[in-house]
């Protein structure tokens, strides 16, 4: 197996689904009741994918999903001969785990994903200068 993806669904939503097209990879989707719901187009894509993910339900708590994900990753590093372990998350807190394992010769990395596919796309509003602020009517 080439890669195992550890997906932080609380953080990236369903933006990982397009990764399912990668052959010879395994997908572990960690989720809680706080994970965003999957939209119908992504659900259809998921159902039609030949590479089916495994879903890992996590206990909720402060950073609960994150701790369970890295525990699972550490366990798999010990028992699996996968070439690459990939954490799919925008949470830079995982970078410490990545550096920890890389210092020990393991091929672990974190890749960010845009979660715009399952949430509203927010407009970025340019900040206004003090001259543009209306202070009285």
Language-model region placement:
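Terminal and domain-boundary accessory regions
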Residues: 1-137
